């Protein structure tokens, strides 16, 4: 192999290694900013064909309906909890702060936070659904499922999910 061809080969290898290293570092840096979207049923029963459940401490977003009668507020602090449900189950969300004005029981909601033990989401942000136009696509897909059953029907599903 002549020296000119050898130096080009070395240069090509170095460039490919540099691109690979740069891509790896960028993906590693962005990893902490990736929040996967789940519905309550996907948290309880797993997501996709492999039924992957979120790990404790994983950042995620959850979308569903606020279960009527589930909102509990602490009178002395801004802490509160409520259940978010879909056709496949219900999950408890805890939040500290002031809720959006449009937050109501029976309304659509998206909460962003960290998955904790007991199928609980410790939310850092809660967004209330206010108009069909502003619903994120993944929430719109999740909401196509049947939400017409009474909220009481989901309490037994949530209890089963918390027991596992």
Swiss-Prot record:
Disulfide bonding pattern of the chain: none
Main location: membrane
Any GO molecular function: heme binding
GO biological process: cytochrome complex assembly
A single cellular component GO annotation: plasma membrane
Keyword Metal-binding included in the entry's annotation: yes
Gene3D superfamilies linked to this entry: Nucleic acid-binding proteins (2.40.50.140)
Sequence positions that bind heme: 130, 134
Bilayer-crossing regions: 9-29
Periplasmic side: 30-164
Cellular compartments annotated: Cell inner membrane
Cytoplasmic topology ranges: 1-8
Pfam family, any one: CcmE
Region named Disordered: 131-164
Residue spans of biased composition, Polar residues class: 154-164
Keywords on record: Cell inner membrane, Cell membrane, Cytochrome c-type biogenesis, Heme, Iron, Membrane, Metal-binding, Signal-anchor, Transmembrane, Transmembrane helix
Domain of life: Bacteria
Topology within the bilayer: Single-pass type II membrane protein
Family affiliation: Belongs to the CcmE/CycJ family.
Role summary: Heme chaperone required for the biogenesis of c-type cytochromes. Transiently binds heme delivered by CcmC and transfers the heme to apo-cytochromes in a process facilitated by CcmF and CcmH.
Protein name (Swiss-Prot/TrEMBL): Cytochrome c-type biogenesis protein CcmE
């Amino acid at each position: 192999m002549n020296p000119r061809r050898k130096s080009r080969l070395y240069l090509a290898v170095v460039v490919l290694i540099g691109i690979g290293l740069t891509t790896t570092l960028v993906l590693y840096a962005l990893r902490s900013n990736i929040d996967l979207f789940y519905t309550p049923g996907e948290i309880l029963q797993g997501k996709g064909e492999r039924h992957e459940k979120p790990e404790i401490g994983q950042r995620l977003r959850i979308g569903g309906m606020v279960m009527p009668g589930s909102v509990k507020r602490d009178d002395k602090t801004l802490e509160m909890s409520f259940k978010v449900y879909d056709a496949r189950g219900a999950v408890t969300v805890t939040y500290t702060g002031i809720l959006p004005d449009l937050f109501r029981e029976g309304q659509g909601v998206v909460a962003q936070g960290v998955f904790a033990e007991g199928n609980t989401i410790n939310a850092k942000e809660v967004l209330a659904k206010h108009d069909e136009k502003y619903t994120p696509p993944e929430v719109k897909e999740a909401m196509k499922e049947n939400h017409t059953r009474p909220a009481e029907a989901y309490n037994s599903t949530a209890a089963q999910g918390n027991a596992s």
